[in-house]
C-alpha cells in the first residue's frame, strides 16, 4: 500500500522569539510495486507550499548532493543553495531490474550484479514576495549569487549497478536540464555516487 506523509510546520511571530509568521505544508506519497519480469520500482511524489513572506533560509531549498554518497531523495548533480521555491513538486523514481539484463551474460550471471535506473525531477516557483533574485525585490533577503527558482523543470537520470560484492552500489547520473554554468556557481552535468546496502 502507498505510504502517505503530511508535514505541517508553523512559525509564529513573537512566540519563543520567532521573527516571522509562516506556514509550510508538505505532502508525500511513496509506493513500491513489481513490474514482472522486469523487477520492481520505488517511487515517491512530493510537493508543498509555504504561505507568507519568509527569508530565503526558510524557503524550500532543494536538496543538492555534492558528495560521492548516493541519496535517493536528493539531486546528485545539483549544487547546495542552487534552487529555492515556495511552491513545488518533485518525483523520485528508482527501478531495480534484479539482473534482468546482466543475468543473460554468463560472467555477469556468476557475479550476480543487478541493474538499477533512476529518474528525479523537480518543478517549483517563487512568488514575488519571496523571490530574492529579482532586481527590485520585495523579499526579506537578497538571494546568494546563483540561487534562483526552478520554474523550468530540473531533471536528472542515472543508471547503476548494485550487489557488487553483495553490498556496494555505484550510480552514474546525468543532469538533463539547467546544464549551463550559472552566475556564481559551476554546474556539474555528471556525477558518480556510491552507496552500501545489502541485497538478498
Question: Positions of the model-derived regions?
Answer:
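Exposed, low-structure sequence patches enriched in small/polar residues
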Residues: 1-200
